Amino acid sequence: MYKVFAFLKRNTELLTHDEYRAGHVGYHCCHSRRLKGIRGYLVNIWSNASLQQQLGPLYDEITRNEPAGFLDLWDGFPQVYFDDWQSWSEAATAEPNRATAEGLAIDPDWRLDDGPYLFDVIEGTEGEFRSHHLHMEEHRILPVERGEQKATKLMQFFRRNPAIPADAFQSAVLGRYAYLNARLNGLQGYTVNFRDADQEAAMRGFFADTAWGFSAAGRAHRQAFCDLWDGAGELFFNSVADFAVARTDPELNLELSALERHLFDAVWYVEVDENVIVMPNRDPAPAFYYR
């Protein structure tokens, strides 16, 4: 599948972090979930609870070179799934999905015009806002099991040790390192994502060629963000406490820590509140409209 992370900063002049959360999940998603051909749609908002305070000394033990002010760079990131790049590039095409007196019709009210008020608007543009839409190469290590209780989702951001070639790095992360993480007690799902080296892969076709993201300023903005990390793991537990217990297993922690020192130039965690807007469906698409 074609998977995109879209990191977004709120409009700080209008909204607090919690107001942004309400505006994104409460209203914006009502429109964006109708993107043509969407196969999955999750919105991750960084949690108000400090993960460092919850984990205590363990946090410092399992993190290294966390970028200062990382959470100041974004408030949330949707992750969307499409069958392929072509489907993603055509996602903003309107479809007839509103019942009217004349039958099914294209909804004239379907628009995403709240963007400049919700997100970090770029002055001097016609409502454009700063974003990092990035294609992610997904590797499902352990399928996510979502119960009725809201799961705890931890994002593990990492940056490659520059002494290790990219191919060897990915093989090592997906090999012994992923195997050990998958053995963490209480783990309910684990996915490893590597950021596409082509930083504009998810932008081409979806955004106009004249979009700010293709300008020198837009490219520099994206490059600075991408320099911080090369990939991210998604780990699911019942609670942060369960993760702490699992990660302090003496045998696992010893080898995981050794591998992290070898593989990663930087590694750190962010707890996010995951909102499931469209449940990811990797099976062949049915021949009818569904969400």
Annotate each predicted stretch with a short phrase:
Residues M1-R291:
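Macromolecular interaction modules
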